[in-house]
Amino acid sequence: IATDAFLGVHASHSYIFAIILSPVGSYYANGMDPVKIYIEREYVRCVKGGTGMAKAGGNYAASLIGQEKADKMGYAQVLWLDGVERKYIDEVGAMNVFFVIDGTVITPSLEDGNILPGVTRASCVEVLKANGYKVEERKLSVDEVKEAHKNGTLTESFGTGTAAVISPVGEYIDGDEHLVINDSKIGPVAQFLYDELTGIQWGKKEDKLGWIVKVN
């Protein structure tokens, strides 16, 4: 939080850095039940060269109108597209996003700097690779996802984040098109990741990746 005693527009020279710890329940009211996601075509969350890669309060301001649209239509979150072509997938409002297409787990790459490099995202990529899954971090268009849904190779989609951990996606809505995934049921990859991550966090599974640090 900026603390300069100044009224105007400039970067602050002093700040308060605070960490808040609080017990929480499931991020979504229905827990691990797959959610419905609205694909936003009109508004964008951020653009290349901006602050999309940062956990900054200002990034949320740009997402509010799109999220209000989704709320009114009964959808849990917004799938944001790139700010130039409105073609490539960035992320979901509160999560990074993954797709399982033809056995490969795909998540949008971070190269353009407009996607938050989430810790849970990175953890999932590491766990998947360590367990023999094929993982690709690359540009992924909505059209490619639609084609995979059409030909039956899109078998799963899920979001990842600190609050939600793993959130299965049961349906994407793009205008009049409804892309129902895995009969709106949680898929095996999402379930595996949730079990692995929470198992390591709670000490119920062996930490083979060296994440756990003993605090004296």
Task: Locate predicted features.
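Short, glycine/charge-rich beta-strand/loop segments that flank catalytic centers
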Residues: 1-5
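Helix-start/capping segments and mature chain N-termini
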Residues: 7-216
